[in-house]
A protein has these predicted regions:
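Non-catalytic structural connector segments
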Residues: 166-182
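Peptidoglycan glycan-strand catalytic modules in the bacterial/periplasmic cell-wall system
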Residues: 1-166
Length: 182
């Protein structure tokens, strides 16, 4: 939440300020610089068919796709609790690949990176998993340890700033070494 969608618990599936901000920055920059999708919008894009059609929303960058995504995100928010939305999101996203094996979902990533079930990981390990999300294959600790450490620590910074963890937990997690191999 602290890294992917700071307003997750207060929005209704979309956050218009984020959408407009990213639209503006992307137009000015002439390319995609920043995303404005909420966790719920990302879930809509990844999982759901539009109006029970076979055709998925997909990942094409079009205004019509974004409108479909917004509508579905609102419907998802009306149908599910925030906890269920977060669970579905974490179980459906891509965490990269190790030895040509794709890691879809947080449980698979936890098993492949740490050799643990998701319930067994600690704060530093969980923060590393979340740190993978913006660019999984460019942040795996076995291939890109500096980037993985930097991004993991940014996740911890965000969590501390938002009050999700205390100073002791923050300091302990930042001291933990990254895994050297899967």
């Amino acid at each position: 939440i602290a890294s992917e969608d700071k307003n997750f618990y207060v929005h209704y599936g979309i956050h218009m300020n984020s959408i407009f901000r990213s639209f503006y920055k992307n137009i000015i920059g002439g390319r995609t610089i920043q995303g404005g999708s909420t966790i719920t919008m990302q879930l809509a894009r990844n999982l759901y068919d539009m109006n029970d059609r076979i055709k998925k929303i997909g990942h094409k960058k079009q205004v019509s796709r974004k409108i479909q995504e917004i509508i579905l995100a609102i419907k998802i928010e009306q149908a599910y609790t925030k906890e269920k939305i977060l669970e579905m999101y974490l179980n459906s996203i891509y965490f990269g690949n190790i030895r040509s094996r794709a890691m879809w979902g947080i449980q698979k990533a936890s098993n492949m990176i740490f050799g643990k079930n998701i319930e067994e990981i600690n704060l530093a390990e969980g923060s590393l998993l979340i740190a993978l999300l913006p660019g999984p294959n460019t942040r795996l600790p076995f291939r890109h340890p500096e980037k993985a450490l930097s991004t993991r620590n940014q996740v911890l910074d965000n969590m501390f700033e938002m009050g999700f963890i205390n100073k002791y937990e923050y300091n302990q997690a930042k001291q933990e070494a990254l895994p050297l191999e899967p």
